[in-house]
Amino acid sequence: MSEVTRVTVWNEFRHEKTDGEEPQKVYPKGMHNAIADYLKKQPGFEVRTATLDEPEHGLTQEVLDNTDVLTWWGHAAHQEVKDEIVERIYKRVLDGMGLIVMHSAHFSKIFKKLMGTSCNLKWREVGEKERLWVIDPSHPIAAGLPEYFEIPHTEMYGERFDIPAPDELVFVSWFEGGEVFRSGCCWHRGAGKVFYFRPGHETFPIYYQKEVLKVIENGVRWAKPSGGPAHYYGHVPEPLEKITSSK
């Protein structure tokens, strides 16, 4: 495990190029660069970006082998992500790479594969207020945050969110229209850690908000490989101790 946490910020990067003025105005360099620019300023991070339209979606085996934590944003082109790249990411997560899944990436191939469920939910896009409550203040992802924070205008996601029960639940969101949502969920998969974080939308400046960026930073620090012992599976012909009772 590297002393520096190597982060790859992945973005579909379609809305900012093709969806008219609003996404381009809000994120002229793409959402991935809004996130990466912040992470590059934080201590202990080495940051690169990758996007869908790059060869191999920017996620060659070499890139993934040199990634401690991968962040993922996608929405309109989930089906364009090649299955072999998804399998490549999946194996790296099981081997210990952290994965941060954001907003509409709940429908991404990699998240659905890791969850084993539909990952479906309710939604509404009218620009309403979201209030995120920290419900586990002892969790590392909540470090440095207030008891709650608000996003002035966002897309609503509502329960039921069809996911396995999280190993750890850090945030719950309330929306101005009345819905609630499990908006900060953690799982362990193999040797890797997965964090789903709800906020983030292509037409709202959410990835410039300090609390949101702090959560992403904390999520990366939590999800990075821990440096624990490697585990081995399969037949073990040589016992650790002498066996005297075998036939």
Where do the model's predicted regions map?
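A glycine-rich, often tryptophan-bearing local segment used as a flexible ligand/cofactor-contacting loop or short
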Residues: 77-145
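Short, solvent-exposed loop/turn segments at secondary-structure boundaries
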Residues: 20-26, 207-210
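Extracellular ligand-binding/catalytic regions of CAZymes and related secreted enzymes
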Residues: 2-4, 125, 189-247
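Helical hinge/lid and interdomain linker segments adjacent to catalytic or ligand-binding clefts
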Residues: 24-108
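Short beta-strand segments enriched in small/hydrophobic residues
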Residues: 2-21
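Cell-envelope and extracellular/periplasmic
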Residues: 12, 73-75, 200, 224
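Catalytic beta-strand/loop cores that center a nucleophilic Ser/Cys/Thr
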Residues: 46-48, 65, 121-198, 233-235, ...
